[in-house]
Amino acid sequence: IILAINSKNNFDDAIKVIRDHKYMILKENHFASIRINWNDKIQNIKEIAKEVNIGLDSIVFFDDDPRNCEIIKIALPEIMTINLPKDPSFYLPLIQSMNDFNTLKITNEDKKRGEIYHKQKQRVELKEKTDNLEEYLKKLETKVNIKNVDESTLSRISQLTMKTNQFNLTTKRYTEEKVRSMMNNSQMLIGGVQVEDKFGDSGITGTFIIKSENIEEWKIDTFLLSCRVIGREVEQAMMSCIVDKAKKEGVKRIIAEFISTKKNLPASNFLEKCGFKNKGKYWVFDLSKEFKRPASISIDIK
């Protein structure tokens, strides 16, 4: 769960309560985005979504003013809007009655989510101060660690397949049991992608699942990346690792499929950008060709 504040208020007065009130458990660093101003809440929500890089349909808006709730429902119907009762003592029972925040298991990334999105804000600020994308990527000093999936990480891999919508080539959903089954299959290769940079560790934010069709051909079953690291050439780094591994194994070609959904437009031209050729249903990469690694990223395969 990512926390954000969208409040019509005087910033100095409101932030003082957050910082100094003795009964305020949540502090400034617990919120991934803060909009305390006199702007309309519709615009604030759009800015929050852009800042933390999530879709509007992933947002739940809580407000104790029925008018604000009605405005958001009309203007942004994809958002779940909850009109809070006037008595704060009813807040907790209301939230506990909702199924939307239920989770079967908490991963390490879940525990660090607030910190991760606080660091994301610092990246946005750096990007705004940098003249061009190439310079920004250099300043980030991004490192990508590719790890074989094991019992300690399979929960996160399953979670990514269940939740990732935007940069996801096939949008296949896998339970932990299914990931474990594939992990123990000698014909399958599953990689967990950990991303870190000068601002900190973003955790495992991507995964790929490869099936060895035969000695000459690999098929990309799943290739996805969390929205918070999209646009930093991490996806190209992931693909370069797959290409390098395939070449070492003597594979001749890699085939992949893009299955279009309402939400995965950001991934629609990725295979073409990587040099895959469209062969009808599948895209094919000829491994006799070179694949250019991103110059701004260091890669460690473990």
Language model features: what each stretch is:
Residues 141-173:
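Short amphipathic alpha-helix that is part of the acyltransferase structural core
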Residues 45-66, 72:
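Conserved Lys-Pro-Asp/Glu-containing loop-to-beta segment of HAD-superfamily phosphomonoesterases
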Residues 24-28, 35-42, 49-52:
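Active-site phosphate-binding/coordination module
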Residues 8-15, 42-44, 66-70, 89-90, ...:
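Flexible loop/turn segments at secondary-structure boundaries
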Residues 51, 73-142, 244-302:
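Terminal substrate-recognition subdomain of acyl/acetyltransferases
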Residues 1-22, 34-36, 153, 169-174, ...:
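Substrate-recognition element of Asp-dependent hydrolases with the DxDx(T/V) motif
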Residues 195-198, 204-280:
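Acyl-donor binding region in acyl/amide transferases
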Residues 54-56, 187-188, 248-251:
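Short, high-confidence coil segments that cap the C-terminus of an alpha-helix
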